[in-house]
Amino acid sequence: MQLNSTEISELIKQRIAQFNVVSEAHNEGTIVSVSDGIIRIHGLAEVMQGEMIALPGNRFAIALNLERDSVGAVVMGPYADLAEGMKVKCTGRILEVPVGRGLLGRVVNTLGEPIDGKGAVEHDGFSPVEMIAPGVIDRQSVDQPVQTGYKSVDAMIPIGRGQRELIIGDRQTGKTALAVDAIINQRDSGIKCIYVAIGQKASTISNVVRKLEEHGALENTIVVVASASESAALQYLAPYAGCAMGEYFRDRGEDALIIYDDLSKQAVAYRQISLLLRRPPGREAYPGDVFYLHSRLLERAARVSAEYVENFTNGEVKGKTGSLTALPIIETQAGDVSAFVPTNVISITDGQIFLESNLFNAGIRPAVNPGISVSRVGGAAQTKIMKKLSGGIRTALAQYRELAAFSQFASDLDDATRKQLNHGQKVTELLKQKQYEPMSVAQQSLSLFAAERGYLEDVEISKVVPFEAALLAYASREHADLLKEINQTGTYNEEIEAKLKGVLDNFKATQSW
């Protein structure tokens, strides 16, 4: 077949017109060094702080140090096969995690990937792990309670929805037990829970998950795990990932509770990363921004106004406030609350529950020290009945501690002092509570009423715990309607007072403890 020049030129024009080229521009760099999970990259001129960098093998690193001629990034996951000369690319994205109701009942890692063997996670989208906390105008004052189920906490150190309450104490003083019981107590409250395990043994986390499942609380809980075997980067980011999952509920007019267990290990992981990135060390070798590490996390726990929720949901949710309540845990060394990280977190939070090893070893559990434990905003959130009945408890314990120390030196004590010491011992005994046995508002109110109105005076100290158990069993059997009314309303008036008095009078008459 012979083509003339005109046909050839027409064919070339046609092909040129149909030619389509798609070009993709990537900001590409080269790894110049790899050590201890930190990579140095040359050539990423347009990288953002905190941006995800795509590595070979479908992995990512996060850019943390932006220097004049190189970028310091921390690898998310294994790094043994990374080598000098490998090419990496910018993604233009900040780290995001999946959020939504589909995560409830699941155990996930820092990146939101399932690690419980139950298949893929259903989610409603992705949310950046780093979010700016709601502003002052978007917030609302704390005035609704979060019941932990512990008498000593709900009576003396009440927690409100949207509050940040620190749980602080030495190792093996019951910090995790208190937090896990608080989650178990939310089964029927409608509060969604997030438990973030940072730097813990896998066996410990497995036990927590099993206990939550046994008590029917796992279906209402998201467990985020960055265990001790995970990289420092994942341990550092885990609290922010958990917080993003909690904010999903807060911003849609619901209530959520998040436990950070514990932030001491997160600070250690961040210190490790900072030192490997050659940032200048400060006090206790922590970097200069370790306060900001925790403040930007804990400020995201808040109670937001109905207007904020309405604007966020584009009018889908109206007239509802949302809240995210945080219970960060800090581990102290030999009770030293004046160390760097504990003082930082104490100053950020709205109060602290201080657990003492001396009390724990003496069998007083939860080992709460009421003298230095405080809730700065929770008092406004207490139910009326708890506020009315708990007033004398803290005073009685404070006087008891003072007199107990004094009585060791005094040989003969007057009757009034003996009476106060006796009452203090019985209140201390009454506030003891076993793990995984949270109490309802009505049950707590009944116990506190017995202590307040002198019903324990003729009960031997060794019989206080059996007395309380028998009283609660009697009340739930004979006066279930009264307990239900108190749980639903939380009010306290002369009628309720008379009914409580009647319950205790009738019970004391049975002598059945």
Curated annotation (Swiss-Prot):
Q: Return the Pfam families for the record.
A: ATP-synt_ab, ATP-synt_ab_C, ATP-synt_ab_N
**The enzyme's E.C. designation:** 7.1.2.2
InterPro entries per the UniProt record, alphabetical: ATP_synth_asu-like_sf, ATP_synth_asu_C, ATP_synth_asu_C_sf, ATP_synth_F1_a_nt-bd_dom, ATP_synth_F1_asu, ATPase_a/bsu_AS, ATPase_F1/V1/A1_a/bsu_N, ATPase_F1/V1/A1_a/bsu_N_sf
Keyword set for this entry? ATP synthesis, ATP-binding, Cell inner membrane, Cell membrane, CF(1), Hydrogen ion transport, Ion transport, Membrane, Nucleotide-binding, Translocase, Transport
Binding positions for ATP per the UniProt entry:
169-176
A GO molecular function for this record? Answer: ATP binding
Q: Cross-referenced CDD domains, in alphabetical order?
A: ATP-synt_F1_alpha_C, ATP-synt_F1_alpha_N, F1-ATPase_alpha_CD
The broad enzyme category this protein falls into is: translocase
Q: Which reaction does it catalyse?
A: ATP + H2O + 4 H(+)(in) = ADP + phosphate + 5 H(+)(out)
Q: Where does it mainly reside?
A: membrane
Q: Where does the record say this protein resides?
A: Cell inner membrane
The cross-references to PROSITE patterns, in alphabetical order and at most eight, read: ATPASE_ALPHA_BETA
Q: What is its membrane topology?
A: Peripheral membrane protein
What are the annotated GO cellular component locations?
plasma membrane; proton-transporting ATP synthase complex
> Is this entry keyworded Cell inner membrane?
yes
Output the SUPFAM superfamilies linked to this UniProt entry.
C-terminal domain of alpha and beta subunits of F1 ATP synthase (SSF47917), N-terminal domain of alpha and beta subunits of F1 ATP synthase (SSF50615), P-loop containing nucleoside triphosphate hydrolases (SSF52540)
Q: Where is this site: Required for activity?
A: 373
Q: What does this chain do?
A: Produces ATP from ADP in the presence of a proton gradient across the membrane. The alpha chain is a regulatory subunit.
- Family according to the record: Belongs to the ATPase alpha/beta chains family.
Q: How does it assemble?
A: F-type ATPases have 2 components, CF(1) - the catalytic core - and CF(0) - the membrane proton channel. CF(1) has five subunits: alpha(3), beta(3), gamma(1), delta(1), epsilon(1). CF(0) has three main subunits: a(1), b(2) and c(9-12). The alpha and beta chains form an alternating ring which encloses part of the gamma chain. CF(1) is attached to CF(0) by a central stalk formed by the gamma and epsilon chains, while a peripheral stalk is formed by the delta and b chains.
State what protein this is by name.
ATP synthase subunit alpha
Organism, by scientific name, is Proteus mirabilis (strain HI4320)
Q: Which gene encodes it?
A: atpA
